[in-house]
């Protein structure tokens, strides 16, 4: 509101039914809100560089943690801010493939009877393909089922079992040599049934569990981690130039995933935080029709 000939701010406020002090307070609040929204916008852009498909609900919680619950808009207003700034997300398509036609021994599913209450009690492993300009490569993952932390990974140009063993050895390196009491769960892929892989587990006291009915829910945590990497890193990006670029980008994403990305299924903790805890974790996961594609 500007002063014009014959109509100053005081008179204009009186005509509109509020005081000049109220006008200046409102203008100050508007300015502060715009400054905060610009800060939130820059923070969201920074986080999306690490995780291009990070959803609106998680971003809202992360902004409240960064700027304070009393300053950040409510959830619905935050979603509107994302919409105004063109920061809402499209829905991604899931993709999956598996093959277990081989001569090696296949173990029964004992993981379905286990509800871990600490880390390094149940590991789940899987392999997913990553497209690059030269064709594709393969991401071998070992994930802790309690904390959802990725404890071992390897990106390779082939499906040879030695690369799955490399990811497993990385997981063993952080857990220690004695795996007594740990259950390792996977699909029936030849890599996990191979003599080399089985030896590394059984020689350290681990028990082996495998899916039985070709049902993705039999290895749900591993499938979910695959989906997060695909939907939040791979699908939104241009195709990786080569395996070296893919390895670098995936490595950075896994660091972000473990250390910064909260999960509803573990009480909105990060996997690294949950990995240090003991006891049941709160599962906040449910369908949120009010979140849309955020």
What are these regions (language model features)?
Residues 116-151, 157-162:
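An active-site-proximal beta-strand-loop segment
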Residues 91-97, 183-188, 202-221, 237-241:
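RNase H-like polynucleotidyl transferase catalytic core
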Residues 177-194, 212-216, 269-272:
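Acidic/histidine-rich, metal-coordinating catalytic segments
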Residues 1-12, 16-17:
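Double-stranded DNA-binding cores of transcription factors and transposases
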Residues 12-13, 23, 44, 59, ...:
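Mobile genetic element proteins and their domesticated derivatives, centered on retroelements
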Residues 195, 202-206, 228-294:
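C-terminal domain-tail junction helix/linker
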Residues 13, 20-119, 215, 270-284:
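Basic, flexible linker segments flanking DNA-binding modules
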Residues 135, 154-177, 193:
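Active-site beta-loop-alpha junctions of metal-dependent nucleic acid enzymes
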């Amino acid at each position: 509101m500007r002063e014009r000939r014959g109509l100053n701010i005081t008179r204009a406020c009186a005509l509109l039914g509020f005081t000049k002090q109220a006008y200046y307070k409102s203008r100050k609040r508007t300015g502060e809100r715009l400054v905060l929204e610009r800060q939130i916008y820059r923070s969201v852009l920074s986080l999306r560089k690490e995780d291009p498909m990070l959803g609106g609900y998680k971003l809202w919680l992360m902004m409240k943690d960064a700027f304070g619950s009393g300053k950040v808009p409510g959830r619905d207003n935050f979603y509107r801010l994302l919409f105004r700034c063109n920061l809402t997300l499209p829905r991604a398509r899931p993709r999956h493939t598996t093959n277990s036609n081989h001569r090696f021994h296949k173990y029964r599913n004992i993981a379905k009877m286990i509800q871990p209450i600490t880390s390094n009690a149940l590991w789940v492993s899987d392999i997913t393909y990553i497209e690059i300009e030269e064709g594709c490569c393969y991401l071998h993952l070992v994930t802790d089922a309690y904390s959802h932390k990725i404890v071992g990974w390897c990106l390779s140009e082939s499906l040879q079992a030695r690369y799955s063993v490399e990811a497993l050895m990385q997981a063993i390196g952080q857990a220690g040599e004695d795996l007594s009491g740990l259950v390792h769960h996977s699909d029936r892929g030849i890599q996990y049934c191979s003599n080399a892989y089985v030896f590394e587990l059984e020689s350290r006291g681990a028990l082996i569990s495998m899916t039985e009915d070709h049902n993705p829910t039999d290895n749900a945590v591993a499938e979910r981690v695959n989906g997060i990497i695909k939907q939040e890193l791979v699908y939104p990006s241009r195709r990786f130039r080569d395996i070296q670029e893919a390895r670098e980008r995936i490595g950075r994403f896994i660091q972000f995933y473990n250390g910064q990305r909260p999960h509803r299924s573990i009480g909105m903790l990060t996997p690294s935080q949950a990995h240090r805890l003991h006891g049941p974790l709160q599962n906040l996961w449910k369908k949120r029709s009010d979140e849309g594609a955020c």
